[in-house]
Each structure stands twice: as structure tokens, then as C-alpha cells.
Design a protein with these regions (language model features):
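Helix-adjacent hinge/juxtasegments
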Residues: 60-61, 72
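A short, structured loop/turn motif at beta-sheet edges
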Residues: 65-66, 97
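Alpha-helical support elements that line or immediately flank enzyme active sites
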Residues: 83-95
Length: 111
């Protein structure tokens, strides 16, 4: 992956989860991230930002400033909110091209 430092936030989060073999600790960490997620502006709560097909109420919005993505999100379910916080923290301030190039080894699938 080019310019690895751009992906430090995502790498740090993935490594934190990989460190523990205890699923309960991983779950608690995701819940903790969800509790820390900043409440978004009310403008996010529109139909076009709603994640379709999810049992929980989930809203996600990306804004581009200076060529970089800045994410906002909300979920009424804490585990979903934690996963959303994981992605927002890991993907914030990357360019769209950088997001597309993320190595699959950093994905949640491998944790």
C-alpha cells in the first residue's frame, strides 16, 4: 500500500482488535468506540443517508473537502454504532482513491 502513514488510523484499529483472541474483549472495544462516536448534525438524518436493509436506524454521510473524505454517521444500536465509529475513524481524511485502494488485509473480515 502506498504511503502507509495515511492508513495509520485504520491499521491501529485493526491491530487493536487482532491483539485479543477473546471475542468478548473485541465486542467491548467496538461498543466503546460506539460510545465515543460524535453525534452528527441533524442534516444527516435524511432518507438519502439512511442505510437500506439494516434492522437498526443507520445514517452515513461523506463530505469532500480539499479532495479528502470526512465521514459522519449515526446508529441507534450500539454495536452498529461501534462498527460505524471504527470505519469513520479509519477512513476519515482519506481521498476516495485511497479508500478504494485499501488492502483487504485491513478489513474487518480478517479480524
Amino acid at each position: 500500500m502506498e504511503n502507509q502513514e495515511k492508513y495509520n488510523n485504520l491499521s491501529r484499529l485493526v491491530e487493536k482488535l487482532k491483539k485479543s483472541d477473546d471475542p468478548k474483549r473485541k465486542y467491548e472495544y467496538i461498543l466503546w468506540l460506539g460510545k465515543k462516536l460524535k453525534e452528527p448534525d441533524n442534516v444527516i438524518f435524511v432518507e438519502e443517508n439512511k442505510v437500506k436493509g439494516c434492522v437498526s436506524e443507520v445514517f452515513v454521510k461523506a463530505n469532500i473537502k480539499g479532495g479528502k473524505l470526512f465521514w459522519e454517521g449515526y446508529s441507534d444500536a450500539l454495536i452498529t454504532k461501534g462498527l460505524l465509529a471504527f470505519l469513520i475513524t479509519g477512513l476519515n481524511e482519506l481521498t476516495p482513491n485511497e479508500v478504494v485502494k485499501i488492502d483487504k488485509k485491513l478489513s474487518l473480515i480478517h479480524i
